[in-house]
Amino acid sequence: MPRKFDVLEHELVPKHVLLSKEEANRLLKAMGLKKSELPWIYSTDPVARALKAKPGDVIMIIRQSPTAGESVAFRLVMRG
């Protein structure tokens, strides 16, 4: 039986976290943003699929950075 590939475990894929509605609302309020102002990630993206993200959800992406130590970005899941 073939092994299933888990995109979230790949060494080149940064950590992705699906935020709850409450977490997303707190984040947007703290940053003074509307959901529509966030960059997009499509619901068909392999990581969004792995997280079972739905359009309207917000994903936090945590990347390791040689200069900043850690870089955090947010994406709005869009139908795609």
From Swiss-Prot:
SUPFAM superfamilies: RPB5-like RNA polymerase subunit. This is DNA-directed RNA polymerase subunit Rpo5. The gene is rpo5. Transmembrane segments: none annotated. It catalyses: RNA(n) + a ribonucleoside 5'-triphosphate = RNA(n+1) + diphosphate. Part of the RNA polymerase complex. Its main location: cytoplasm. Belongs to the archaeal Rpo5/eukaryotic RPB5 RNA polymerase subunit family. It is found in: Cytoplasm. Keywords: Cytoplasm, DNA-directed RNA polymerase, Nucleotidyltransferase, Transcription, Transferase. One of its GO terms (biological process) is transcription elongation by RNA polymerase I. HAMAP family: RNApol_Rpo5_RPB5. Its EC number is 2.7.7.6. DNA-dependent RNA polymerase (RNAP) catalyzes the transcription of DNA into RNA using the four ribonucleoside triphosphates as substrates. The lineage of its organism: Archaea, Thermoproteota, Thermoprotei, Thermofilales, Thermofilaceae. One of its GO terms (cellular component) is DNA-directed RNA polymerase complex. One of its GO terms (molecular function) is DNA binding. InterPro entries: Arch_Rpo5/euc_Rpb5, RNA_pol_subH/Rpb5_C, RNA_pol_subH/Rpb5_CS, RPB5-like_sf. It is an enzyme of class 2 (transferase).
